Amino acid sequence: MEVAGSASEWAVGFEDECWWSRVALPTLNACSPDGEPLRLIQRSVARDDPEPKALSCYGLYLPQIDQTWLRFVDGRPVSSITARFLGWCSQKLEAQAKKVLVLIWDNASWHISKELRRWLGSHNRRLKRSGKGVRIVVCLLPKQSPWLNAIEPKWIHGKRKVVEADGLLGAYELAERVCRVFDCPHHEHLTVPQKVA
C-alpha cells in the first residue's frame, strides 16, 4: 500500500458492498432540537409496497483523493455485477490517468468466485495487450478481520446520517440521501444482464 500510495499512476481502493435499509434503524445517539433524546420509531413496509425493503450498494473508497464512488444494485451483489462495477471504476480511474488499482476487499463469495477471477484475468490481459486501461491488483483482507476495510466506518456513519426520524423513505429517496452523504452523483443502478433465449 505504501508503494501504491507514493506512485502517481497507482490508486489504492477499498471496495465493499452495503445494504441500505428503509426500515432497520442504526445505532444512534442524538438529541432532538428541543434537547430531548431523539426517539426513533421502528417502521414497517406494507405488504403491497412495490419498493424493496433495502437497497444493495457497491462502494469504492479512494483515500488518496478522499472520494467514495457508489453504484446501487437492482437485486443483490453477485459476481457479474461486481465485474460491471469494477469496469466502471476502471474507466473513471483511467480518466484520472491512473494505470493500476490496488483493490483491497474482503473474502465475500462473489469476490473470490471463478467468474470474477476469470473476469479480472481477462481484464488485465486485455489492457496488457492494448496498453490502455487500469490494471487491477487484488488484495484480500484476512477472513477474521473485515473491519480492516477502510470503507466500513463510512457505511456506519452514512447510515446514521440518512435515517428518517419522521417516516419511511422511498427507495429512490434513500438512494439520493446516501449519494448526498457521500457527495457523489446517483448513477443508474447496476443490474444483471438478462439472457435472451
Which residues does each PLM region occupy?
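Extended, low-complexity cationic-aromatic segments
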Residues: 1-88
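Short, basic/hydrophobic alpha-helical segments
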Residues: 81-102
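RNase H-like polynucleotidyl transferase catalytic core
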Residues: 37-48, 123-153, 166-167
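C-terminal anion-handling pockets and recognition modules
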Residues: 9-10, 134-135, 144, 148-197
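Acidic/histidine-rich, metal-coordinating catalytic segments
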Residues: 16, 98-112, 141-144, 149
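Conserved Walker B catalytic segment
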Residues: 116-124
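Mobile genetic element proteins and their domesticated derivatives, centered on retroelements
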Residues: 14-16, 59, 86, 106, ...
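A short acidic (Asp/Glu
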Residues: 23-26, 113-117, 151
